[in-house]
Amino acid sequence: MVSAILEGKPDKNLILVTGRIHPKLAEDVAEQLGIDVLETTAYDFANGEMYVRYTESVRGADVFVLQSHYKPINKAIMEQLIMIDALKRASARSITAVCPLLGYSRQDKKHRGREPISCRLVFDLLKTAGADRIMSVDLHAAQSQGFFDGPVDHLVAMPVLVDYIRDRFQGHLDNVAVVSPDAGRIRVAEQWAQRLGGGPLAFVHKTRDITRPNQAVANRVVGDVAGKDCVLVDDLIDTAGTIAGACHVLQDAGAKSVTVVATHGVLSGPAVERLKNCGAREVVLTDTVPIPEEKRWDGLTVLSIAPLLASAIRAVFEDGSVAELFDTYPEHHGQGFLFA
């Protein structure tokens, strides 16, 4: 039941709905916006098909459908598609698919012949279902937002994470080196270094067999990290093979400490054990996907992405600028970092 409606221009109503993957994040976003999540009836039939129905009218509303594409990923995507279809048929004024983690984003190009570009397919499915706009956090490749025929708000968690790291290393930022886990993300590492005061950069050279998923070998460090507090930054940690290997290589190269930072903590299979035993001082993630208690440990810090999502949703609803959020963050939302 909606107890409050965010008022924008006349005759505009904002409604937030959520799938079943990460309702806690939706509740946190709603709290930031000063509204409640619209109640939704959703359940599975015996054969695995899903049913969705909204308990109140959405006619003429600007609706934001929050669903992280997390395990079971195909079910998560399908549920969001069904939710969007129901909104379109119920005459919602506009529909924004809020996908903190967009599924299949790593399959954004063909490595070999006869392969799909699954990321493009997900964008096409969202458009066909009725999404007018997509909002996501740290796509694996920023250019993949061009797959969608419509506006895409590509949010970045870097301000949230940098704010935390700056606080953790207060007084010692001059000894921080930013490290990319591979050459492909060196541009992101450069942006990190600029925000942290222009410290040194390094990257880990790795090799990957494209015929064997979730396997990469970290070979050597390119750059001087001896005696440095290394901040190892990535967009997503899945099985943690790349990150754990990079930690070991950095330690072998004489790093004083290694702090692992990533936006999406998928943490599949052996990831937790690898991260616990990789020698990292701390692992810092955001809550774009749910991280259950059994996957948490003393060395893990989870920051809330809800203030960033709420600010972006508010900007879209009020016809404001999403880009300006990142020019003024954290001053814009005034909350620093929150823990999830």
From Swiss-Prot:
Q: Which Pfam families match?
A: Pribosyl_synth, Pribosyltran_N
The alphabetical list of record keywords is:
ATP-binding, Cytoplasm, Kinase, Magnesium, Metal-binding, Nucleotide biosynthesis, Nucleotide-binding, Transferase
Keyword Ribonucleoprotein annotated = no
Q: Where does Mg(2+) 2 bind?
A: 182
Metabolic or biological pathway, per its Swiss-Prot or TrEMBL entry = Metabolic intermediate biosynthesis; 5-phospho-alpha-D-ribose 1-diphosphate biosynthesis; 5-phospho-alpha-D-ribose 1-diphosphate from D-ribose 5-phosphate (route I): step 1/1
Question: Which residues participate in D-ribose 5-phosphate binding?
Answer: 208, 234, 238-242
Q: Where is the active site?
A: 206
**Quaternary structure and interacting proteins, as annotated:** Homohexamer.
* PANTHER family registered for this protein in UniProt: RIBOSE-PHOSPHATE DIPHOSPHOKINASE FAMILY MEMBER, RIBOSE-PHOSPHATE PYROPHOSPHOKINASE 1, CHLOROPLASTIC
What task does this protein carry out? Answer: Involved in the biosynthesis of the central metabolite phospho-alpha-D-ribosyl-1-pyrophosphate (PRPP) via the transfer of pyrophosphoryl group from ATP to 1-hydroxyl of ribose-5-phosphate (Rib-5-P).
Protein name (Swiss-Prot/TrEMBL): Ribose-phosphate pyrophosphokinase
